[in-house]
């Protein structure tokens, strides 16, 4: 049986039989699909599929689409300051302080809008004028650092009268009254504790450590060391023994 199979194989090889592989079939299938897509026309637009794909993915169309996207994003997002604009110092204010003040004003305006106060209403105009007045009246940080410190600021609770005499302030009087009240409370607690100990008989008890006395009620014991003799230890018999 094996000889018949080998003979058939030799005959087929001699005749030049074409064995089609699966790879060739797959390539033919891909070519048929590409041909079908090339000749396919859309029913709604009546245009070829390949033409629409070529136009959608062309470099010019991609560039236009990217430019439109950039313009839309630029319009939506607010402009952020550049590095040299952040460090720009208008007048005496540093760039960071200026932007910090701008952020504070933005949060304040949002809070007013949330509370219902419109900047165009009479109340809003009054608040705006009040803020401008406070800005003009408030000293700058450099002026506060350069301003000398008065001696009156250092004296806590002391003020000068018209005639030149010094009067103790209310804060100093309040602190003195508080301290005296605390001392009185402590003294009252000590007196109450001593009275309770005296009534219950605890006031006569005290420690007897290190005291010499002859009272029978008080005990003071002094322990004396005694040595024992060990026969199985070297030098045990040389130790002096107690006289018993």
Swiss-Prot record:
GO terms for cellular component: nucleus; U4/U6 x U5 tri-snRNP complex. GO terms for molecular function: RNA binding. Residues 1-11, 20-116, 126-182 have a biased composition (Basic and acidic residues). Signal peptide: none annotated. InterPro entries: SNRNP27. One of its GO terms (biological process) is mRNA cis splicing, via spliceosome. It holds the Pfam family SNRNP27. Residues 183-192 have a biased composition (Acidic residues). The modification Phosphoserine is found at residues 121, 140. It is found in: Nucleus. Its main location: nucleus. Keywords: mRNA processing, mRNA splicing, Nucleus, Phosphoprotein. Coiled coil: none annotated. Residues 1-192, 223-244 are annotated as: Disordered. May play a role in mRNA splicing. Part of a tri-snRNP complex. This is U4/U6.U5 tri-snRNP-associated protein 3-like protein C162.01c.
